[in-house]
Curated annotation (Swiss-Prot):
This is Serine protease 52. It comes from Mus musculus (Mouse). GO terms for cellular component: membrane. The lineage of its organism: Eukaryota, Metazoa, Chordata, Craniata, Vertebrata. Belongs to the peptidase S1 family. Residues 56-287 form the Peptidase S1 domain. It is an enzyme of class 3 (hydrolase).
Length: 321
């Protein structure tokens, strides 16, 4: 009997270490940015939890520590579109950014809010995946994945954004859009070097569909009651991020900047790809490429707790047998 128990212990140890390693790999939780106290110590713009200090057209300069998932996608050294970090291997963006482009000259910049920073870090793109049903006229299924040639070194200014299959816009609050797109529509072609951010509200699909007849169910819209605040040219592919109403500490990507009728016009909200409709496609595509990505399913239990629960159940089974 003692020998059998020793044998079970020998079998248990590697399994426990394997599960512990799996849980430890999730320690860098998506959507959790630097706390306001730590940010002040680093002489960055102070934030209140869930409320960026920055207020794109009508926006204000943002610090990368407020939106550490935001990246710039470059083509031949020029800013092309925005994107967001899903994990150390993957960047999420919009398909329309890459019309008739290949990945040979694509790079991303990350970890900075200033495009003019000396010694800026570039990361080469290895593969580009456009949605197979992308419609370049309607801009339906306007979503793309970029696989990097080497993994990102995640840190306080390079943090993955969370995604979720929750589609109900009522579940979200405190939504923001970021980008290096134009800030003044009268100065076309002039883009800022400093990242901009603007707060927006999510609007009901039926109301948006009445105003914008080309809206599909794969899109959502967001804007403000004040004209002059919106995403614009150059912001495409960037993330529309929100907090859950019951959890203001974690940020989720709800939309991808896609299209609009002008920028910041009254009663004409911006249109975004609805990310919740594509989390399973993202999961399947990344798995096929050999670099799987896990999204948060519509569950009350976080993934890290699930790991702990597995460990606990395994120990209980061990003690009872």
């Amino acid at each position: 009997m003692k020998r059998w128990k020793d044998r079970r212990t020998g079998l248990l140890l590697p399994l426990v270490l394997l599960l512990f390693g799996a849980c430890s790999s999730l320690a860098w939780v998506c959507g959790r940015r630097m706390s306001s106290r730590s940010q002040q110590l680093n002489n960055a713009s102070a934030i209140v939890e869930g409320k960026p200090a920055s207020a794109i057209v009508g926006g204000k300069p943002a610090n990368i520590l407020e939106f550490p998932w935001h990246v710039g996608i470059m083509n031949h050294g020029s800013h092309l579109c925005g994107g967001s970090i899903l994990n150390e291997w993957w960047v999420l963006s919009a398909s329309h950014c890459f019309d008739q482009l290949n990945n040979s000259k694509l790079e991303i910049i990350h970890g900075t809010e200033d495009l003019s920073t000396k010694g800026i870090k570039y990361q080469k793109v290895d593969k580009l995946f456009l949605h197979p049903k992308f419609d370049d006229w309607l801009l339906d299924n306007d979503i793309a994945l970029l696989l990097l040639k080497s993994p990102l070194n995640l840190s306080v200014n390079r943090i993955p954004i969370c995604t979720s299959e929750i589609s109900d816009i009522q579940a979200w609050r405190n939504c923001w859009v970021t980008g290096w797109g134009i800030t003044n529509t009268s100065e076309k072609g002039v883009q800022p070097t400093i990242l901009q951010a603007v707060k927006v509200d999510l609007y009901r699909w039926d109301w948006c569909g009445y105003i914008l007849s080309l809206l599909t169910k794969n899109m959502l819209c967001a804007g403000t009651q004040d004209p002059g605040k919106d995403a614009c040219q150059g912001d495409s592919g960037g993330a529309l991020v929100c907090n859950k109403k019951r959890n203001t500490a974690i940020w989720y990507q709800v939309g991808i900047v896609s299209w609009g009728m002008g920028c910041g016009k009254k009663n004409l909200p911006g249109v975004y790809t609805k990310v919740s409709h594509y989390v399973r496609w993202i999961s399947k595509q990344t798995a096929k490429a050999g670099r799987p990505y896990m999204y948060e399913q519509n569950s009350a239990c976080p993934l890290v707790l699930s790991c702990r629960a597995i460990l606990f159940l395994y120990f209980v089974m061990f003690l009872l047998t």
